[in-house]
Amino acid sequence: MASPLPLLKEDADETSEGVIVRNTSTGQLEDPFLKLRVMIIDEEFYRGVRDKLYSSFKSGASAILYAMGLGYGELMGLKMEEMKMSKIEVIRSFIDLGKTKGYGKFHTPFLKMILSGLMGEPAVRLEDSFFATSVGKTGKTECFLMAGIIAGASQVLLQKKFSCIEEKCLCKGDEYCEFKLKEKY
């Protein structure tokens, strides 16, 4: 059994980046970076929700997952904008947040995108995707929720309309998940 990561601290202060804290006055788990209450979910929880969506809505479930991610990504982007940090600091924080929240490890060209003004279709690579490892091998892309999160956050932070398509996925047998941001005109 793997040793637990030091992600939970009792009543940590605002400088406690990279951790989830328990607010001792409320007993609730919080993200001190985004200043939001959090809940921890496991792979079975996500798989159960996903499987029920697919059994109820068939192929429409992927659109629902994408829309849910889009909404969350937009809210995350707005929350990060409120922090009055430079775009580079915001993007670095977003990448770190991916690790802290357990999404996986991001490799993105976002810093280059900000500096060069977004040309082409940037790829966002996600290693060890929580969503893909939760579902297992299916032979198709499965990270619709993450694609929505990437699109939503990018729209807010880069102030352009995007769709995000997952082209590579662990569920298809690829070594990592890869998403392409496509600007909408």
Question: Where do the protein language model's features map onto the residues?
Answer:
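N-terminal accessory segment detector
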Residues: 1-144, 163, 168-178, 182-185
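Active-site helix/loop of acyl-thioester processing domains in fatty-acid/polyketide metabolism
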Residues: 144-159
